[in-house]
């Protein structure tokens, strides 16, 4: 049986971005749940979350959440008494911006210098350890449980015809309200200026 991997990119490197950190600090279990669901869907038994070492609270909460999930039988062998086994490891990024690129991130998880690989082959064919891999960011994984609970039509009812759902943005700078805002895809800057006017 060929090994497959599920990888989460929690290494947001854009200046002023803290969307991933907020999710990982506030509700790390939602990402673990989504990764296990993804693992089940593709037949993977191992996942990795790649997170910035500069996010010590996120790292600590992820470590606690992974331990709790293992204790409750939500990660590990024979989840819910089935033949499905899936576990998640945590890998800390060293702050290299290039590791936000998916192939560089996988190279870093493998223990090598985080440098991009030529494509093709694409990660779905030859990704982590040269095995089929799905890689998504924190926000994408965090959406999965909500879509399963509320249905695809619910998610598709937000956004535009070509870009469904919502997007989280970090608002900063010389504005009235800083922080995170989740808005439907396709929302124009004019639509949310009331959030940001000084």
Description of each model-found segment:
Residues 59-185:
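Hydrophobic alpha-helical positions that pack around
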Residues 187-189:
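Short, structural beta-strand-to-alpha-helix junction motif
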Residues 193-198:
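Conserved small/polar residues in nucleotide/adenosyl-binding loops
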Residues 28-40:
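Histidine-anchored nucleotide/phosphate-binding helix
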Residues 47-53:
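Short internal beta-strands
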Residues 22-28:
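Short, glycine-rich nucleotide/cofactor-binding loops
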Residues 9-20, 170-175:
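Gly-rich Lys/Arg/Thr-decorated short loops/hinges at beta-loop-alpha junctions or inter-strand turns
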Residues 1-7:
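Conserved oxyanion/phosphate-binding beta-strand-loop segments in alpha/beta enzyme cores
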């Amino acid at each position: 049986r060929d090994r497959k991997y599920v990888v989460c990119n929690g290494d947001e490197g854009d200046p002023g971005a803290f969307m991933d950190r907020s999710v990982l600090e506030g509700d790390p279990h939602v990402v673990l749940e989504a990764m296990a669901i993804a693992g089940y869907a593709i037949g993977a038994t191992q996942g990795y979350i790649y997170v910035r070492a500069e996010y010590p609270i996120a790292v600590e909460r992820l470590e606690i959440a992974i331990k709790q999930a293992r204790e409750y039988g939500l990660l590990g062998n024979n989840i819910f008494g089935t033949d499905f086994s899936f576990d998640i490891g945590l890998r800390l990024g060293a702050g290299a911006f290039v590791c936000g690129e998916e192939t560089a991130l996988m190279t870093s998880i493998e223990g090598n210098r985080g440098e991009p690989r030529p494509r093709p082959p694409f990660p779905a064919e030859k990704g982590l350890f040269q095995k089929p891999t799905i890689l998504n960011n924190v926000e994408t994984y965090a959406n999965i449980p909500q879509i399963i609970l509320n249905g695809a039509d619910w998610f598709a009812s937000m956004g535009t015809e070509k870009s469904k759902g919502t997007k989280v943005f970090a608002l900063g700078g010389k504005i009235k309200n800083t922080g995170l805002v989740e808005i439907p895809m396709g929302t124009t800057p004019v639509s949310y200026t009331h959030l940001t006017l000084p």
